[in-house]
Amino acid sequence: MSPEFPPFLSPCMNITNMLHKCVAWTIEYYSEDVRLEIAAMPFGIRAAYVRLTEMLQEFGLDLRMPHSRAMGGGLFELRPRGKEGIARVFYCTMVGRRIVVLHSFIKKTQETPKRELDVARKRQKEVCGS
């Protein structure tokens, strides 16, 4: 007779995998337009973004420089870089280990343009209520 496993625990799943799946962060997008803007970024930047989001799902708020940076007031930025340039992707977090991607842009200057930051903060207020 084979042992019965609870539906969430298959025989091939070890405890480490189970714990990892339980604590992983989920990533959502403010809108379909935000997701499409990121999908339209140059290949190298997009590849870096995918790698960073995988790290973000695993480490959440523990992801730090040079990959992510706190912008203050609960707003954060991912910092994807490719041979084509540098992008910034703003996000906030919500209860239930949820990350909401708010806005993205390709950097052309050393400083983050105020307009880009304002868009992210406005969306953060709408979504995260902070």
Each predicted region: which residue ranges?
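Portal/gating segments that form or line small-molecule/metal binding sites
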Residues: V89
